[in-house]
């Protein structure tokens, strides 16, 4: 009987109806001058929770003295600030680190700036080795990852995917405990039992089959979305966004002249996240994103099965009363912040922090976005600001529902999903919070003049037809390396240790082509945009464009030269501007490096969404959506933005023409615009849970 169980488990794990993901890696030749830098960067991130006395970095970092090398940094002030904090005592090793914990954040920002202002890579490497040996592990990785992205001499360097660096933040604790068990036992004591527990062994690697969270974590059918909100690519996207635009750093340093659009970027990214999430809700029959009031009981519980390498994550009960206990002062601050914004809108003017802003101007979206993020550019003309007394940070703290620590380090902080950019998207409260923020920003947009027919109409250009291939989604298995979750023995550090691989089904879609038939009276260079939005709301009723403009997600943005007469454009989903392939594993990176190559999209397109998440999961009968295609004259980006062409195609606002409310829907029936009804079909299992009782008989309203 036991043998039958083992065989049944093996069959269900190895098959389960899902294909296996295969990489098709687009590579580029790595500049020979960067090869040594690339190798050293990767070496500092391997097994980062522990130090290896036999590694090069340890011997360098153990002896390096920052104070004795002050001349090796281009900004003496940041060295002085770092040393002041370092001598006072940084957070100890093995403590949970979050950028939302104030004292820890002040320290890690000082460390990042020390890295950033190292005069050359040799100094940067020595400083990083010092931090790797002596400082808190989480602070080191956070600051180092950021510095590699933003330093000029490390541009072109590939970094491992976030889920390979922090595996414990991307899988549930049941899988983590199995990995710990195998590491402690030094393998499977009875190999035949492995498949029964969801563990397979092959070629010095252990494969752990992982499920997504169920009703124990999410109530009210929210668990139907766990395959999406717990997707490692979805959560990595948000982490990359923070690394490209950390709220506490000045925009001039991060994005140069694009700083004047930082607040606009903030709005655009969160609109895209919420629009994509909303489509997935509709596909699962869950309806609208719930709204909440800070003074009422919060109804959305969350019981994460996550654990840091030291502490389990805090849980939030249903009927959680937000405005109670330690939250009273925070709720008052939040309430005042919201009311202040509405009062500013009524006045039409903001005058503070040594700046004056006309809130009825479309370019003021930059200020409005900065206001809600409370980032460094909002306060650039005034002395240093406490970013942890911001709306975002305070709201996360309240919704996280963690017990408050009375002592900064000794008592530690109980982590919540909202404390980390790697895990925030797993908590349904995240989407409800940012839906609230976007509601306020859209209040500002209501004061802007809607686009007129003259602005939207492109005279002489007509889209005759749009045809789309059959849209199909499915689940497939994907392997990712979780070895960084464990501590290796001294012997394993110096040998080829076993790899611990998590195997998990993920949403994907079949490649498709959008065929656009355009008639033009003249030869011209144009911009083509493709959007995807809902056809019906959560009740199965058609949505008017007045209510629906905010729900469209921009899929593609490209230029094209039209000739006089008929033009046919075939745009493949693999070409879509805002999407990329999944990150390859660290093993694959090393394999490519041996030939002097790196994955090109992990260098300059890491910030985009995985291509397999273009479409929401379909249904067997077809999930109805609408594609919107628009063509308009090309205006080149201003010269100052040339260095940011991987983010910008033309000179229009991000999300145009859905960057403003639609008050007259018939204005969007111009000849150069086209709405196309499409359906998304799901092949195979509707939910990635093998024989899951909890996901049976759940269908959308469409």
Swiss-Prot record:
Residues 1-16 form the signal peptide. It holds the Pfam family Hemocyanin_N. The keyword Glycoprotein applies. Keywords: Glycoprotein, Secreted, Signal, Storage protein. Larval storage protein (LSP) which may serve as a store of amino acids for synthesis of adult proteins. Binds the A.niger cell wall component alpha-1,3-glucan, a fungal pathogen-associated molecular pattern (PAMP) that activates the host immune response. Belongs to the hemocyanin family. SUPFAM superfamilies: Di-copper centre-containing domain, E set domains, Hemocyanin, N-terminal domain. This is Arylphorin. The keyword Manganese does not apply. GO terms for molecular function: nutrient reservoir activity. Glycans are attached at residues 211, 481.
């Amino acid at each position: 009987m036991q043998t039958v169980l083992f065989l049944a488990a093996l069959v269900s794990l190895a098959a389960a109806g899902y294909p296996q993901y295969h990489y098709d890696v687009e590579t580029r030749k790595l500049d020979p001058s960067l090869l040594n830098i690339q190798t050293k960067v990767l070496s500092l991130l391997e097994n980062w929770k522990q130090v290896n006395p036999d590694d090069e970095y340890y011997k360098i970092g153990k002896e390096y003295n920052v104070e004795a090398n002050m001349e090796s940094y281009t900004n003496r002030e940041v060295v002085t600030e770092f040393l002041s904090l370092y001598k006072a005592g940084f957070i100890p090793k093995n403590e949970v680190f979050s950028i939302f914990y104030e004292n820890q954040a002040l320290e890690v920002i000082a460390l990042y700036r020390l890295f950033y202002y190292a005069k050359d890579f040799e100094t940067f490497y020595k400083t990083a080795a010092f931090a790797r040996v002596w400082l808190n592990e989480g602070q080191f990785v956070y600051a180092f990852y950021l510095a590699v992205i933003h330093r000029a001499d490390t541009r072109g360097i590939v970094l491992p995917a976030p889920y390979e660096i922090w595996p414990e933040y991307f899988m549930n604790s049941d899988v983590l405990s199995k990995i710990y068990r195998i590491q402690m036992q030094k393998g499977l004591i009875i190999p035949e039992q492995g498949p029964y527990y969801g563990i397979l062994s092959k070629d010095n690697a252990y494969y752990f089959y992982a499920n997504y969270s169920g009703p124990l974590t999410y109530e009210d059918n929210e668990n139907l979305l766990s395959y999406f909100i717990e997707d490692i690519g979805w959560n990595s996207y948000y982490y990359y966004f923070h690394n490209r635009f950390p709220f506490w750093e000045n925009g001039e340093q991060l994005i140069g002249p694009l700083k004047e659009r930082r607040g606009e970027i903030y709005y655009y990214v969160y609109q895209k996240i919420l629009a994509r999430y909303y489509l997935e809700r509709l596909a699962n029959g869950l309806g609208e994103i719930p709204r909440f009031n800070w003074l009422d009981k919060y109804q959305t519980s969350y019981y994460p099965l996550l654990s840091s390498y030291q502490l389990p994550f805090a849980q939030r009960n249903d009927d959680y009363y937000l405005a109670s206990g330690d939250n009273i002062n925070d709720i008052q601050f939040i309430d005042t912040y919201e009311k202040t914004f509405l009062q500013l809108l009524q006045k039409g003017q903001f005058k503070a922090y040594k700046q004056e802003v006309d809130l009825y101007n479309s370019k003021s979206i930059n200020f409005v976005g900065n206001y809600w993020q409370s980032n460094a550019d909002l306060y650039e003309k005034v002395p240093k600001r406490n970013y942890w007394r911001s709306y975002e940070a305070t709201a996360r703290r309240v919704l996280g529902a963690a017990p408050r620590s009375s002592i900064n380090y000794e008592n530690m902080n109980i982590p919540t999903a909202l404390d980390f950019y790697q895990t925030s998207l797993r908590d349904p409260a995240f989407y409800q919070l940012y839906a609230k923020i976007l509601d306020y920003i859209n209040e500002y947009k209501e004061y802007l003049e809607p686009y007129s027919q003259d602005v939207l109409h492109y005279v002489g250009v007509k889209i005759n037809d749009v045809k789309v291939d059959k849209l199909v989604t499915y689940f497939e298995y994907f392997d990712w390396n979780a070895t960084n979750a464990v501590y290796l023995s001294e012997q394993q550090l110096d040998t080829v240790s076993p790899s611990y691989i998590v195997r998990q089904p993920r949403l994907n879609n079949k490649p498709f082509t959008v065929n656009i038939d355009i008639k033009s009276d003249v030869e011209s260079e144009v911009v083509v945009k493709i959007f995807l939005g809902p056809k019906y709301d959560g009740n199965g009723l058609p949505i008017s464009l007045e209510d629906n403009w905010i729900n469209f997600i921009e899929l593609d943005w490209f230029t094209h030269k039209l000739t006089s007469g008929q033009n046919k454009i075939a745009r493949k989903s693999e070409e879509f501007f805002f999407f990329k392939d999944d990150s390859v594993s660290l093993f694959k990176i090393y394999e490519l490096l041996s030939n002097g190559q790196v994955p090109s999209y992990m260098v300059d397109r890491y910030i985009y969404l995985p291509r397999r998440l273009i479409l929401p999961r379909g249904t067997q009968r077809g999930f109805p959506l609408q594609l919107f295609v628009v063509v308009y004259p090309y205006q080149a980006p201003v010269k100052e933005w040339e260095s940011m062409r991987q983010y910008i195609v033309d000179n229009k606002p991000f999300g145009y023409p859905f960057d403003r409310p639609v008050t007259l829907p018939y204005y969007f029936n111009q000849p150069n615009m086209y709405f196309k009804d499409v359906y998304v079909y799901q092949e195979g299992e509707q939910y990635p849970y093998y024989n899951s009782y909890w996901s049976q008989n759940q269908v959308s309203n469409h």
